[in-house]
Each structure stands twice: as structure tokens, then as C-alpha cells.
């Protein structure tokens, strides 16, 4: 097997990694390295006098053989890229004979081995990963579209909290759609040379993918900021600037992505804009994402501390407990019933009792552990695992977690914060079965409020 045929076979194997990793095109790195080596070899050969007896410098597709005198042997190590296959690359020898260069010895498949079983194993593995993330994104898109339709159609559910949820759902849809667009544009088929592809569609798909990713992280951060402000506020009517969150959630990704596109057009308009993660312009995209994940993690810890401090038996006030049940555990607080006055009025005739709305069941340890787990998909805390590692680190674990499980994040968020939301379920039931609208006030929370002893009242409050 000659060097060109062996290089082609290696590229076929590397292409499997490229399809699975999206922007980590190992085969493109290999091709780029070969092209650089070939160019350097040809330039060196042009500056050498080949008129003397012997063998001229030549490029055989993998290695650059220098000018050599007749009867001499030359030994060169295999290209460094073969070390990716976990084996120690050997060396190849060639003899300069009277008739020219001899064939490489040992042959390239022997000197620069690639385990043949990798072809089948890696193809099966990466194909499975692609099927998983394609299925996950498809399910997420359907679930998120239904969730947005519900939150938009039911007027009683309109409030800042659900507005932010809707924006986050939209970013998950955009992110999943960008994955499909990029797969279609960059990996159109096995014969597509996406390493040298420089079409407008390819570049647009990469830019849209980066924009979708940034908007998703920005709205994950918006969720954390909103909840932190909500829990830290002292007045039930104090609200964070919702429209500032909207402006930041969509405006900052537009600004960063636009800046990155401008830099690529001006300074690095090569191939499909998605090959060199070492480029300094890559940090225009990567930097804000790393920062948002770090801030989100800090807010996550801060929220847990606030809940521990304010939700104790003697410290949990009306406003904080209301926000806790309404935001973190929206499906587990039983619905309030219509107030009923007592008919057996005795000495305590000034007391009006309303059925408990579920706060009594909000035991701190159990609720705190549940809310902690539920904040992880809502804030994207799981991204902290790989976000500060190099893109090529831990690929064996990173691929199934980030591409596979990450594709279902939108579905999980839609289920937890819409389909299992008690407020949403009751409003749907009211619309479907015609229940009394008073059973679901527009902005209901599960709280209780105790007035002075002679007139103890338990009421429902409105807080979103």
C-alpha cells in the first residue's frame, strides 16, 4: 500500500471523529499539517541543486524525503499525527538507488500502524452518539414548542417568571435547530470536503451555531439572576428589571457573534470558520460562555445559601417562602381551595380559616435537596464539569455527556417547569373542563400569613 492510499484510509477513519465532534475536525488538522509539510518540502526542493548524481528531494504524500546521494539510506519517523491512535509510530526507510528512490520499507501500514478494529468500533460508537443527540434535540424541540404555546396561550400564566422561561425555551429550540443546520451544511455526505469548504451556507451555519449557543447560556444566566434578585428582595413588589434581562439575554450574543464574524471576515476568512480553536478570535465566543458558566455556578451556591438562611422554621418569611414554592417547586404545592367561613362560631368567632396551601409540607431538607437538583438543568450547572477544560480533553466521557445528555436538557426543563407545573396543569384543567376560575388566581403562590392572635387569617398571596 503506497503512502497516498494509506493517507486516504487514515482520513476516512479520522472523518468519523470529525462528524461526532462537530468543530474538532481531527482529519482537517491532519490535512492541514500535510499541506504545510508538502509546501515546505517543495520550497526546500526548489532551493536545492538536483543536477548532481543521486536522488532529488521529493514528497510522497506523507513524508518529505531530502536530496540523497546514490547508495545511501534515509530513515524518517512517521508523521506525528499517527500518535492519536495510541500506538508508537515507527520509522520508514528508503534507499537511493541508481534508478531512483526505492519503495518505503517497511510499508507505511506496518511502520505507521492504525489498529484496524478502530474503524468498526469508532464508527459504531460515534454513529450511536449522533443518533442520541439527534433524537434528544428532536424530542426537545417538540416539547419546548408545546411548552411555549401553553405559556403564551393561557393568559393567566403571563408573568415575568414565565416570560423568562419562555425566552429560555426559545433558546433551546434555536440551539437544537442550529445543530441540525450545521450538520446539514458541513457534513452533507462522506464525499464532502468540509476541511476546505468555504461556502456561505457553511459559514452562516457556524455563525448561527455560535449565536444559538451564546443565547442559551445568556438566558440560563438570566434565570439565575432573576431568581437571585427575587429571593434577595425584601418587598413582595420589588422586581428585577425584566427588560434589561431581555436586552442582555439577546443583545450580548448578537454583539459578541457580530464581532466574531467581523474578525473572521477581516483576518481569518478561511475554510468554514470552524477549524482552528487556537485562534485568538475564538475567545470572543468562548470567553463570555466560560464567564457565564462561572457566574451561574456562583449564583447557584448563593441561592442555596439564601434558602438555607431564610427557609428555616423561624426565619422563613411570607415573601421568601412564597417565592421558594412558586419558583423552585412549582408543581408540588397543592392548589388552594375557595375560602370558606366557619359556621360553628364560638368564642373565637373573629378567626377566619382558609385551607392550608401547602407551605406546611415544605420541609426544608427534602425541598432543598429537590430544588438543588432541579436548579441544575435550569441553570446549566452541569456545564461546569467540562467548561474549563480544553475542548479535546476527556472526549470519551465528554461526548456522551455533552452531546448526548445535553441534547435532552431542553426536554427536561420543559417538563419540570411547564408540564409538571401545578399552575399550568390547573389552568389547562380549568380551560378543558370548565373549572371555577377562582380556583386559580392569576398569580398564585403557596403561602400563609398570620395576623395578630385575635384574628388569625391564612390567605393566598399573588407573587410571580
UniProtKB/Swiss-Prot annotation:
GO terms for cellular component: cell surface; cytoplasm; membrane; nuclear inner membrane; nuclear matrix; nuclear outer membrane; plasma membrane; sarcolemma. One of its GO terms (biological process) is positive regulation of growth hormone secretion. Glycans are attached at residue 50. Disulfide bonds join 41-64, 55-96, 78-112. It comes from the Eukaryota. Its main location: membrane. InterPro entries: GPCR_2, GPCR_2-like_7TM, GPCR_2_extracell_dom_sf, GPCR_2_extracellular_dom, GPCR_2_GHRH_rcpt, GPCR_2_secretin-like, GPCR_2_secretin-like_CS. It is a multi-pass membrane protein. SMART domains: HormR. Gene3D superfamilies: GPCR, family 2, extracellular hormone receptor domain, Rhodopsin 7-helix transmembrane proteins. Residues 1-22 form the signal peptide. The chain crosses the membrane at residues 131-151, 168-188, 211-231, 241-261, 284-304, 373-393, 399-419. Keywords: Cell membrane, Disulfide bond, G-protein coupled receptor, Glycoprotein, Membrane, Receptor, Signal, Transducer, Transmembrane, Transmembrane helix. Residues 152-167, 232-240, 305-372, 420-464 are cytoplasmic. Residues 23-130, 189-210, 262-283, 394-398 are extracellular. GO terms for molecular function: G protein-coupled peptide receptor activity; growth factor binding; growth hormone-releasing hormone receptor activity; peptide hormone binding. It is found in: Cell membrane. It holds the Pfam family 7tm_2. Belongs to the G-protein coupled receptor 2 family. This is Growth hormone-releasing hormone receptor. It comes from Rattus norvegicus. The lineage of its organism: Eukaryota, Metazoa, Chordata, Craniata, Vertebrata. The gene is Ghrhr.
Amino acid at each position: 500500500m503506497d503512502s497516498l492510499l494509506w493517507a486516504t484510509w487514515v482520513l476516512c477513519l479520522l472523518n468519523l471523529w470529525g462528524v461526532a465532534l462537530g468543530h474538532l475536525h481531527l482529519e482537517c488538522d491532519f490535512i492541514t499539517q500535510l499541506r504545510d509539510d508538502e509546501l515546505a518540502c517543495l520550497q526546500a526542493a526548489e532551493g536545492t541543486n538536483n543536477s548532481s548524481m543521486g536522488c532529488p528531494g521529493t514528497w510522497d504524500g506523507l513524508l518529505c524525503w531530502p536530496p540523497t546521494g546514490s547508495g545511501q539510506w534515509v530513515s524518517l519517523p512517521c508523521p506525528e499525527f499517527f500518535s492519536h491512535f495510541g500506538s508508537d509510530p515507527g520509522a520508514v526507510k528508503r534507499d537511493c538507488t541508481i534508478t531512483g528512490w526505492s519503495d518505503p520499507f517497511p510499508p507505511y501500514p506496518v511502520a505507521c500502524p492504525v489498529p484496524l478494529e478502530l474503524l468498526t468500533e469508532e464508527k459504531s460508537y460515534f454513529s450511536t452518539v449522533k443518533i442520541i443527540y439527534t433524537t434528544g434535540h428532536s424530542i426537545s424541540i417538540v416539547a419546548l414548542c408545546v411548552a411555549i404555546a401553553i405559556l403564551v396561550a393561557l393568559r393567566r400564566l403571563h408573568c415575568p417568571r414565565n416570560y423568562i422561561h419562555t425566552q429560555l425555551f426559545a433558546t433551546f429550540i434555536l440551539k437544537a435547530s442550529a445543530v441540525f443546520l450545521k450538520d446539514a451544511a458541513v457534513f452533507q455526505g462522506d464525499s464532502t470536503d468540509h476541511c476546505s469548504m468555504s461556502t456561505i451556507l457553511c459559514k452562516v451555519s457556524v455563525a448561527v451555531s455560535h449565536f444559538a449557543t451564546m443565547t442559551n447560556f445568556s438566558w440560563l444566566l438570566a434565570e439565575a439572576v432573576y431568581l437571585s434578585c427575587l429571593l434577595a428582595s425584601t418587598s413582595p413588589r420589588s422586581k428585577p428589571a425584566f427588560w434589561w434581562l431581555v436586552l442582555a439575554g439577546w443583545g450580548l450574543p448578537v454583539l459578541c457573534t457580530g464581532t466574531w464574524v467581523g474578525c473572521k471576515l477581516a483576518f481569518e476568512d478561511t475554510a468554514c470558520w470552524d477549524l482552528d480553536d487556537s485562534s485568538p478570535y475564538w475567545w470572543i465566543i468562548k470567553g463570555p460562555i466560560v464567564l457565564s458558566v462561572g457566574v451561574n455556578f456562583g449564583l447557584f451556591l448563593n441561592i442555596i445559601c439564601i434558602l438555607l438562611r431564610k427557609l428555616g422554621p423561624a426565619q422563613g418569611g411570607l415573601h421568601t417562602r412564597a417565592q421558594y414554592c412558586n419558583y423552585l417547586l412549582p408543581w408540588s404545592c397543592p392548589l388552594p381551595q375557595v375560602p370558606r367561613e366557619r359556621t360553628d362560631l364560638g368564642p373565637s368567632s373573629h378567626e377566619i380559616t382558609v385551607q392550608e396551601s401547602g407551605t406546611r409540607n415544605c420541609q426544608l431538607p427534602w425541598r432543598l435537596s429537590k430544588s438543588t437538583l432541579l436548579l441544575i438543568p435550569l441553570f446549566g450547572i452541569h456545564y461546569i464539569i467540562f467548561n474549563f477544560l480544553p475542548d479535546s480533553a476527556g472526549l470519551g466521557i465528554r461526548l456522551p455527556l455533552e452531546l448526548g445528555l445535553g441534547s435532552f436538557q431542553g426536554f427536561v426543563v420543559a417538563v419540570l417547569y411547564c408540564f409538571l407545573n401545578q399552575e399550568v396543569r390547573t389552568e389547562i384543567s380549568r380551560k378543558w373542563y370548565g373549572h371555577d376560575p377562582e380556583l386559580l388566581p392569576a398569580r398564585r403562590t403557596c403561602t400563609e400569613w398570620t395576623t395578630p392572635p385575635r384574628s388569625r387569617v391564612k390567605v393566598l398571596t399573588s407573587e410571580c
